[in-house]
Amino acid sequence: IELIKKTKINNYYIKNQEDFRKRIVEDINIDDDVLDIGKGMRDKFENIKSKNITTVDVNDFGDYPDIIYDICSDPDETLLKKFDKIVCLAVLEHVYDPFLAVKNIKLMLKENGVLYGYVPYLFYYHAPRSLKFQDYFRFSKDALSYLFKDFKSIEIFPIRGRISTPLNILFAGRWKKYIEKTGINILLDKFVSDTKNSEQCSGYNFIVKK
């Protein structure tokens, strides 16, 4: 119960049509060492003030990553306490041991370092047909409280509310790409309380501090 109380819930991204990555770009300082796991910030690199950006992935995609590394395995000593900011967008659902992955991410963060991420909750299956990576897990707000229990602070940002979440599943891919851009999801979810929207959502952005 104390872990759940420790978690701050912020409904900003249910009520505003804004990319969470904008917040990440704004938070990164010019002298920060940054690790992007899965390269979820790839199209934002030119907007990031710091140029000390390292990319990591379990697969080799040719032009990235800088380091091929399974985050469920022990990190190289050169990566320990190296990074001020770590970004992990839509990755933890694809690893076979998210608890071990988070433990290793914490080891790579400097003291007071910050982890930014996203995980799905009520969301459709989305492993590629090639099975280059798999789709293992979904995370409720309570799961995130426990997953990040060893961090100083946890703030989670629900994505989509109780009404727009099933529509996103029903119109998989098309909802986000076309319909959601009109802002109709914000209008629909206004008919539901903040609490219900935060509990019956598509997924969560999160910011946790070591």
Question: Which sequence ranges carry the predicted segments?
Answer:
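S-adenosyl-L-methionine-dependent methyltransferase catalytic module, highlighting the catalytic core
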Residues: 96-100, 104, 114-209
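A short beta-strand submotif of the Rossmann-like class I SAM-dependent methyltransferase core
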Residues: 85-91
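Conserved short-loop catalytic and cofactor-binding motifs
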Residues: 74, 89, 131-132
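Surface-exposed loop/turn positions
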Residues: 32, 112-113
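Short, solvent-exposed loop/turn segments at secondary-structure junctions
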Residues: 40-44, 59-61, 72, 93, ...
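Conserved N-terminal segment of class I S-adenosyl-L-methionine
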Residues: 1-81, 85, 201-204
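Redox-cofactor binding/interface segments in oxidoreductases and associated redox assembly factors
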Residues: 36, 88, 117
